[in-house]
Amino acid sequence: MKLLTLTKLVLSMTFLLIISINAENTIYAKFETPQVTITGNADDPAIWVNEMESNLSIVFGTDKYNGIYSYNLKGEVIGFASAGRINNLDIRTLNDTNYFFGTNTGSNTIDLWIYKNSVLTDAAKAKKFALSDNARYSKKTNFLAYGICAGITAKNEIIAFVTEAKGPRIQLWKFDNDNLKLMSTFNNDNASESEGCVFDDENMTLFVSEENARGIIRSYKLTNEFELKDMFKIDDRQRNIVGDPEGLALYKTSKNDGYLVASSQGNNTFNIYQRNYPYDFISSFVVGDSNLIDGVSDTDGIEIKNNYFNEDFPNGIIVVQDGKNTGNVIKSKENFKYISLDQLQHILDL
């Protein structure tokens, strides 16, 4: 009887803690996209920021068995690329040129699309844009390609990291002279599988999520010689991660400061860490149900931009994949949710 009472007490305290976190750190979606066409397929968002006409920015979302959707800032579809099994997508902009990197799990390739700002702006004005069905560049990874994150080095080099499904490897690619070149291959420690990653351009730091057997977020420093060094274990299941750590995103408050945000998939929360070493855990938040839009659960990909977009997103935007779109009849079909960044700023007391 005493053991049973103690167990009930512990469970009750845990429940109250969860309720407390949810009550204080709950944010809500402002818009959502339509569901993807096939069950269980939405995965990773990416955002092209229109620096000249911010309201004409474009959100992209992968439908990982079909291709890539394009959305406006209200979550409305403005195009679809039948690009195949694009699992993850990331974007970097240098001068007036935009580089869209994707991983194709059907062909096990790193794919690259390139567009000028003017092309994207004109298309956004016309409310019609899709990436081409065929990437401009495509190279075999020679392993099961899974996640991807792009970057720009201090020397203005366009790079991308590809993570391996069912293995520890990470490839570093560089785009130069109209060519995708494999620069090096590393191991994410002894990981069994990695997907989510994000590269901090200004701090030359790679963050990677390990899934499956263990749930670990690690950081690595990238040298000018394209070597990953100084591995650091930021968090794991013995601390603040439940289930798999999935999508990773940076919320930059200045050139070198800000926060790392990670999807803790097992308890439908998002963890917040300091952007810089030792990457201290700060807090967690959830995306809850509102009167119009359901909450978010089982999230894979996440993206954050702190630009002014419009009156709906005056301080920035968070876009997350919703793995259980419970507000619709077909609950197993997924979509993407848009959240105003000012809600996260309130949690962080910024």
Mark where each language-model region is.
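Sequence/structural signature of beta-propeller domains
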Residues: E24-L350
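Sec/Tat signal peptide C-region and signal peptidase I cleavage site
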Residues: I19-A23
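Bacterial N-terminal signal peptides that target proteins for export
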Residues: M1-V10
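Bacterial N-terminal signal peptides
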Residues: V10-I18
